[in-house]
């Protein structure tokens, strides 16, 4: 099933942008909750901000446990709304680099589509400066992966993305936004524990690292 278009609610889009701007040095990632209609249009109603198990400037990884938790959250929203909600996509940021997906992004997207052919990927390119106006820009795109005709590799196909205006922030999106500071704090605590567990650190380094916990 080739997705024809993606419609994302304005408040869900706001959460994605806020999350993307939360860190300039590494990529961030989350999952999109919504439904797919009979016209093969994906409707994104909310997003889930995920805690990163590995923080890098050019990639991000999420634990299987969090993917399972996202499915549980989608089931909860389905009961509340009475609509067939499920995890319909993922999003991640590209700080200081192009909005176009890397070969790793394209392969990751292809892997997700093996589980759900209607799965989509969103990328938010942030901390980009317009050379003419010297103002910051945020670029975004939506894509899927397809098998290249003359290669075993995958290539991206762009999916039209439409932001549906919303006058207010719904409770489900507000809850996601409120979770962001807590998740960022947890990530820093996890990083501290990993460094603190290294046996070769000297006492001065341990005291310095511990002062910021």
Regions found by a protein language model. Name each.
Residues 1-89, 93-213:
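MPN/JAMM (Mov34/JAB) isopeptidase/deubiquitinase module and associated MPN-bearing subunits/adaptors
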